[in-house]
Amino acid sequence: MGIFCGLLAALSWGTTDVFIMGLTRRVGTSRALVYTQLGCLLTICLLLLAQHQTPTSNPKLWLLVLGCGVCHVAGMLLMYRAFEIGSLALVSPIGSGFAVVTALLALASGERPAAAALLGALILCCGVVLVTRSHSDQKATMAGVPHAIGSAFAFGAMFWALGFVTPHMGPVWPLLVLRLMALSSAVFTFLIQKRRNTLEPITDKKRIWPLTLGVVATDTIAWIAFNVGVRSDYTTIVTALASLYSAVTVVIAWGLFRERLAPSQWTGVAVIFLGILLVSI
């Protein structure tokens, strides 16, 4: 069950990245965050109403969920910005390095993954180094890379903590907190930029809502799948499988947008995928 859920999350998040890229480049990061987080929050509320599930009263679990929310907001803001200014086929694999952070934290907290998983974590780090090295047009290729790296650390810590939360709270209640915090942060950022008159202009109104609905649907499916997965399997394994979303994103970016990377960077992308696969063994 955990393997299936991890792969489903990977497929869904990989598709989400493409929708996010299209949306942020048409309405900017702030508007995209408000639109998508509001849609996701409404979806989560509908799921909770349908479930009739009573939330836990354990204050420690709620504090841990709040910590997850902080990491989620930080990782999301950094990743949205990376998608807006960077190359999709480059920043997405780097962002998927959150699996390394999760694996290391899980190991430190008592999980004992196989030796292949530890080797995969090391290989993945080497792949990130290769991808972030630019030998040609440095300004074009390195744009968004620092944001993607920061996002990987934030999401890695969040996914590790969710492994302790979802077995007691279920797959949906933690998402409510994450969405509320993400929407609050998005609205705050939007209002500041609006007051400073620094909002990005809307360039294509016709495709805003289809792209927003695409993000809401695929992102919600991915989150539910991940949370169900970590209830039945090691957090390290499910997170590593979910991080394969970057492979889906790169294939779509290569097929639809014809994004190009230097040969050494493609080598780094391949090494990242190898590391992710080893972590999941």
Regions found by a protein language model. Give the residues of each.
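Short hydrophobic alpha-helical membrane-embedded segments
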Residues: 34-39, 92-98, 150-153, 217-218, ...
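Hydrophobic/small/kink-forming positions within alpha-helical transmembrane segments
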Residues: 10, 14, 18, 45, ...
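C-terminal appended segment following the main domain
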Residues: 226-281
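Hydrophobic transmembrane alpha-helices of multi-pass small-molecule transport proteins
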Residues: 39, 101-105, 114-133, 264-281
